[in-house]
Amino acid sequence: DIQMTQTTSSLSASLGDRVTISCRASQDISNYLNWYQQKPDGTVKLLIYYTSRLHSGVPSRFSGSGSGTDYSLTISNLEQEDIATYFCQQGNMLPRTFGGGTKLEIKR
């Protein structure tokens, strides 16, 4: 199986900040990288698919980039509603494995 690693398990930022969350695959996944958002109430939403394509209805402050084994999700102008845990998932090979998640919190 392809292992997905999110080295930062939690991240604290201020409203209005630009935040970048990273993900690394154990082998080349040919840009088949998705990002999911899990809200504190458990709701899960697909944000980005195929590295950089925004899912329908996702605000343009979310963007994705990367290639090969290294990928990132950037949130520009962080809003309160963005407080959640973010997971990367590779879709290049079955099983479609996930990273361990990065929990984003507001800096106090």
Swiss-Prot record:
Record's GO cellular component terms: immunoglobulin complex
Keyword Disulfide bond: yes
Residue numbers spanned by region Framework-4: 98-108
Listed GO biological process terms: adaptive immune response; immune response
Residue segments, region Complementarity-determining-2: 50-56
Region feature Framework-1, mapped onto this chain: 1-23
Name of the molecule in the record: Ig kappa chain V-V region HP 93G7
Lineage: Eukaryota, Metazoa, Chordata, Craniata, Vertebrata
